[in-house]
């Protein structure tokens, strides 16, 4: 049976778009409306991600996909969402290769990314897995966050209670983009999405991330354990990042951005307006 003969609910599978550790994403087509969708198929239950995305949709949060369907497919669970053709990384690379003033375009993308975080955090959700793979771009050039499997509520509105900052021994999300605060044992909060976003922005501006080419050190500890030798080294480099940027790049945008987000307390609301202004100022 070819891929195009497979149906998941009302969606015909067109082609495989990508595969992760726990799921595979396909491009699909609704059998009646012919609307193109993204189909995420996983052997793991996706109820948590589905609930997060449904909640964000109910809260009318801009910058996230629309959840179109959720259900079973054989032994797998599946969700159908809005389809986006371009990954953020590919979109940015095309900007650098084809635009007369690519930096100006990338600055605009940074403003969009900050606004998406503002929108999500205003709904009391932390994304928790900020990295280039988890952002797409629609046909109009609008950036969208995806993959909410690690996302969580950081504030209980009904009880008016902020999540406790408990000592944690494991990183959440990619070690490469995990916030420095997580490396030193803090729980995740909005400040950490903003810190991880800054690390990601380095790559968007083609700035070398100091820890990106690190060789993983062999250890009996899990890779996500903050005591893993590789994570201890990453923590040191992330701690010294601002000085690295000052000396190496004399960066006008990311140095002041990191200065602001690095000073945030666990429960402190990030100053999204101020961050947007940093990247809205022309060089």
Indicate residue ranges for each PLM-predicted region.
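ATP-binding glycine-rich loop module of kinase domains
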Residues: 22-48
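Short beta-strand micro-motifs within the conserved protein kinase catalytic domain, predominantly
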Residues: 66-77, 85
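Structural motif in protein kinase domains
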Residues: 84-95
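Activation segment signature within eukaryotic-like protein kinase domains
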Residues: 109-110
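Catalytic-loop of the protein kinase fold
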Residues: 121-138
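Activation segment/activation loop of eukaryotic-type protein kinase catalytic domains
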Residues: 138-172
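Protein kinase subdomain VIII
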Residues: 159, 170-186
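Conserved C-lobe activation region of Hanks-type protein kinase-like domains
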Residues: 182-247
């Amino acid at each position: 049976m070819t891929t195009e003969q497979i149906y998941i609910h009302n969606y015909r599978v067109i082609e495989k778009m990508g595969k992760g550790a726990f799921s595979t994403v396909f491009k699909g087509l609704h059998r009646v409306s012919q609307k193109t969708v993204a189909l995420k198929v996983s052997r793991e239950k996706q109820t948590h991600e589905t609930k997060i995305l449904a909640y964000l949709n109910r809260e009318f949060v801009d910058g996230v996909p629309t959840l179109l369907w959720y259900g079973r497919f054989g032994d797998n669970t599946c969700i159908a969402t809005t389809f986006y053709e371009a990954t953020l990384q590919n979109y940015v690379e095309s900007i650098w290769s084809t635009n007369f003033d690519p930096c100006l375009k990338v600055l605009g993308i940074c403003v969009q990314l900050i606004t998406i975080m503002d929108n999500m955090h205003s709904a009391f959700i932390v994304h928790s897995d900020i990295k280039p793979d988890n952002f797409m771009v629609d046909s109009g050039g609008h950036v969208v966050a995806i993959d909410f499997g690690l996302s969580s509520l950081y504030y209980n509105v009904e009880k008016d209670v902020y999540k406790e900052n408990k000592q944690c021994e494991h990183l959440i999300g990619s070690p490469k983009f995990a916030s420095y605060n997580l490396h030193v044992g803090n729980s995740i909060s909005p400040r950490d999405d903003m810190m991880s976003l800054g690390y990601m922005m380095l790559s968007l501006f083609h700035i070398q991330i100091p820890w990106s080419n690190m060789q993983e050190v062999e250890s009996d500890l899990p890779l996500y354990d903050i005591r893993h030798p590789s994570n201890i080294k990453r923590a040191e480099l992330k701690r010294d990042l601002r000085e690295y940027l000052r000396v190496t790049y004399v960066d006008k945008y990311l140095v002041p951005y990191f200065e602001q987000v690095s000073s945030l307390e666990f429960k402190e609301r990030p100053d999204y307006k101020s961050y947007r202004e940093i990247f809205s100022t022309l060089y």
